[in-house]
Amino acid sequence: MENNTILKKYPMNKIMTSMLLFGFIITGFSDLLLHGKMSYSSIMGMNTSRVYFYTFFLLIIGCWLLYNKWFVGIGFICLATFSSYFTEYVSIHNYFASIAIYFGLIIDVIIRKKMKWLIPLIIVGLLQGIAFQTGWFGYYMVGFMEFSGLCIGSIFIIKTI
């Protein structure tokens, strides 16, 4: 009886989306802490087995989000495509793919008319951009901004499904 109530209150696509997004956040963050890295990008490109794992994970998340009509899925697919493991893709990974996620999320916010969500996303995006460009914040700040951006974006997506 309780199981039926949970599925009525939370649709299956909301449960699946939250499992995928927060599964990625928790897996990446724990992997990051265990290996002493400073950002999600650095842990994703650490070795070939991680490249395969995170690429597959990001492709699943991106396709799932696109299937559920979320443009931010394009950004996840870009992150999967341009892995930071390959040195020729590092700048594309750091700039194009990260920006694609923010643009996709901003488009999703505008389409769903939830403008108050733009404020924290813009703040986190600007701080992450500054952290990438300067050594002023250090790379720990880049990792913290990646974590914050992923959490804020994931909460927005899950709340509005």
Positions of the model-derived regions?
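N-terminal topogenic module of multi-pass integral membrane proteins
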Residues: 1-66
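Membrane-interfacial loop-to-transmembrane-helix junctions in polytopic alpha-helical membrane proteins
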Residues: 8-15, 48, 85-93, 138-141
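Hydrophobic residues within membrane-embedded alpha-helical segments of Major Facilitator Superfamily
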Residues: 19, 26, 58, 65, ...
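Juxtamembrane "helix-exit" motif on the non-cytosolic side of transmembrane helices
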Residues: 32-36, 81-89, 129-138
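Hydrophobic cores of alpha-helical transmembrane segments in multi-pass inner/ER membrane proteins
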Residues: 53-64, 100-110, 148-161
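Membrane-proximal helix-loop-helix units in multi-pass membrane proteins
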Residues: 70-120
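Terminal transmembrane helical module of multi-pass membrane proteins
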Residues: 116-161
